[in-house]
């Protein structure tokens, strides 16, 4: 299972979103954005507000913010930390406005200013960027801004003070001597590589991808135990298993739809079915709270968000808000690139 440890996997990638970085990623540079009008789009009795696409390229950050607004555990912790961090305060204010019912679309200006001040980098919005990289950068920045003087878990409805962060356990067992080594790492998401679009699989389930990614056979493995007993025969094979020891309250699942092939940079539109509810380790129950889709190709495209609010599914397409449904959200099997599941009973982690 590919995971995203803090400040390791995407640390270099998200720096390219900001001015001052050496270069822009090839992926971002190839994007030509297509977006809806920034005019006012009001929906009577809507539970959420839209976000203006101010630069014409803001769909990547708008969909991330809309997705976060549906995460109840995040809103709870932001509320508690408003007085200790300007970034927490402006993000909480923005997400609350998004959830405040029908009205004119809003802009995330104050929050983005706080984010730029916190990172001392200017957000590049003149070209389309990657929503997953922006999300990872935001999660890591929130973690760095977290106050360490108070045990917030004592007053939260969930036992950890970082809802995006979990602990992964890696077990490696030698196929020759059966020795087992165990290590732990911090992770914020699951990154899943997808099978080729024309591999013969018309539809692949998310659960099957997660299970296949959880356990891997490694043929070229050097076993320390075998080396001690017979240095000449220390090269062997092993079974590597990666699983959550303590899963996060908010589970991010990234579907990697862009890959490099012999034909260059390509987009993978393989159909991936995903459930509305998910169970980890046979005891941690999750519900799908939001998802981000991307339409287009590697050279142009547009992000939008499907999110659950007040028991109703909505489609947030920048400033345009339309009523959706769970079935419509689950039908985005060829365009979904980022899924947000929130734990239904977080206190079960205690």
Curated annotation (Swiss-Prot):
It comes from the Eukaryota. Its EC number is 3.4.19.12. Keywords: Hydrolase, Protease, Thiol protease, Ubl conjugation pathway. It holds the Pfam family UCH. The active site is at residues 59, 302. One of its GO terms (molecular function) is metal-dependent deubiquitinase activity. Residues 49-344 form the USP domain. Belongs to the peptidase C19 family. This is Ubiquitin carboxyl-terminal hydrolase 11. It comes from Schizosaccharomyces pombe (strain 972 / ATCC 24843) (Fission yeast).
């Amino acid at each position: 299972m590919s995971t995203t440890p803090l400040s390791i996997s995407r640390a270099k990638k998200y720096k390219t979103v900001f001015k001052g970085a050496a270069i822009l990623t090839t992926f971002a540079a190839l994007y030509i954005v297509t977006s809806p009008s920034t005019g006012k789009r009001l929906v009577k009795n809507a539970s959420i507000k839209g976000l203006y696409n101010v630069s014409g390229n803001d769909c990547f950050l708008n969909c991330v913010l809309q997705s976060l607004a549906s995460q109840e555990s995040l809103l709870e912790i932001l509320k508690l930390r408003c007085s200790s961090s300007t970034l927490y305060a402006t993000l909480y204010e923005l997400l609350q406005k998004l959830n405040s019912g029908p009205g004119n679309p809003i802009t995330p200006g104050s929050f983005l200013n706080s984010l730029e001040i916190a990172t001392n980098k200017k957000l590049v919005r003149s070209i389309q960027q990657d929503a997953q990289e922006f999300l990872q950068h935001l999660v890591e920045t929130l973690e760095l801004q977290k106050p360490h003087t108070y045990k917030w878990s004592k007053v939260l409805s969930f036992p950890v003070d970082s809802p995006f962060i979990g602990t992964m356990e890696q077990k490696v067992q030698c196929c020759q001597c059966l020795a087992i080594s165990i290590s732990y790492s911090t992770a914020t998401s699951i990154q899943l590589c997808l099978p080729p679009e024309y591999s013969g699989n018309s539809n692949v389930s998310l659960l099957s991808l997660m299970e296949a990614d959880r356990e891997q056979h490694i043929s070229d493995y050097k076993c320390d135990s075998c080396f001690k007993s017979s240095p000449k025969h220390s090269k062997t094979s092993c079974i590597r298993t990666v699983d959550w020891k303590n899963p996060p309250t908010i589970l991010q699942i990234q579907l990697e739809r862009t890959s490099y092939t012999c034909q260059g940079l390509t987009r993978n539109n393989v159909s991936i079915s995903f459930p509305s509810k998910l169970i980890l380790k046979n005891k941690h129950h999750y519900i799908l709270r939001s998802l981000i889709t991307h339409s287009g190709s590697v050279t142009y495209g547009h992000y939008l968000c499907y999110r659950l609010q007040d028991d109703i599914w909505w489609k947030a397409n920048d400033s345009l808000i339309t009523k959706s449904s769970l079935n419509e959200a689950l039908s985005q099997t060829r365009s979904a690139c980022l899924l947000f599941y929130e734990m239904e009973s977080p206190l079960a982690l205690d």
